[in-house]
C-alpha cells in the first residue's frame, strides 16, 4: 500500500499575500507499507531561495513509552552534530531511552549523528529498527514535540510517549552547552534554494534481529 502526500509551505514577510505562492517551499513524502510490517519513507524538499533556513529536515515520530532501550550504530556515545563531533567514535552503542532524552527545554538537542541504524526496543527485546540504504541520518529522542512550548522541562518529562526525530539534513549544533566543541566538519548547514531528499525504513524487530545487525 502506498500513500503519497505533497505540501506547500508558504513563507510570509508581511507583504502582499498574493505574492506568497511563488515563494513556497515544496515538500513531498511517500509512505510504502508492506504486509510484514515494514514501512519505507521517502521525503523530498525544495527550499525556496528566499525562505528562512530550517534547523533541520526531519521526520517526527511518536513512539510508545514502552520502548525503553536504544541501540544504534553511528557516532557516540555522547551527543554529536553535523559540525561538532566531540571525541566521538563510530561504533554500536546502547543506552536507556531516558538517558538520551535531554532535560532542557530546547526544541533540538541530544542528537546522535552519522547513524546507520537505530533500534528502539522494550524489556522483552521487541520493537522497531530504523535504517537507511541511501543516507546516514541523525536522531534524537525527546518527551516533547519540537513545536511544543513548555514553561518547565518537568512539564513534559512524564508524557506517555517518546518523540523520535529522524534527521535527514541537520544544520549543525543548536545547543549552547556544546558550543565550545572544536571538531568541525563541512556540509553542516542547509542552504536556501536547496533540493534535499532522504529515505529510511522502519522494520519490526526482536532482540535476535538487532543482534544480527551488530
Region spans (language model):
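Beta-strand/loop-rich accessory regions of lumenal/periplasmic or secreted enzymes
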Residues: 1-214
Amino acid at each position: 500500500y502506498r500513500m503519497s502526500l505533497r505540501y506547500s509551505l508558504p513563507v510570509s514577510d508581511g507583504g502582499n499575500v498574493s505574492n506568497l505562492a511563488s515563494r513556497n517551499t515544496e515538500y513531498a513524502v511517500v509512505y510504502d507499507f508492506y504486509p510484514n510490517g515494514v514501512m519505507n519513507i521517502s521525503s523530498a524538499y525544495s527550499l525556496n531561495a528566499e525562505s528562512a533556513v530550517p534547523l533541520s529536515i526531519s521526520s517526527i515520530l511518536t513512539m510508545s513509552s514502552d520502548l525503553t532501550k536504544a541501540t544504534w550504530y553511528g557516532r557516540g556515545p555522547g551527543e554529536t552534530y553535523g559540525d561538532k563531533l566531540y571525541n566521538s567514535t563510530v561504533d554500536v552503542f546502547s543506552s536507556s531511552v531516558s538517558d538520551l532524552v535531554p532535560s532542557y527545554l530546547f526544541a533540538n538537542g541530544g542528537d546522535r549523528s552519522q547513524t546507520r541504524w537505530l533500534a528502539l526496543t522494550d524489556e522483552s527485546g521487541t520493537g522497531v529498527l530504523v535504517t537507511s540504504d541511501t543516507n546516514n541520518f541523525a536522531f534524537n529522542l525527546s518527551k516533547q514535540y519540537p513545536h511544543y512550548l513548555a514553561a518547565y522541562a518537568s512539564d513534559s518529562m512524564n508524557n506517555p510517549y517518546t518523540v523520535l526525530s529522524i534527521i535527514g539534513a541537520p544544520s549543525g549544533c543548536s545547543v549552547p552547552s556544546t558550543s565550545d566543541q572544536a571538531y568541525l566538519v563541512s556540509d553542516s548547514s542547509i542552504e536556501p534554494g536547496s533540493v534535499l531528499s532522504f529515505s529510511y525504513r522502519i522494520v519490526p524487530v526482536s532482540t535476535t534481529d538487532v543482534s544480527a545487525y551488530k
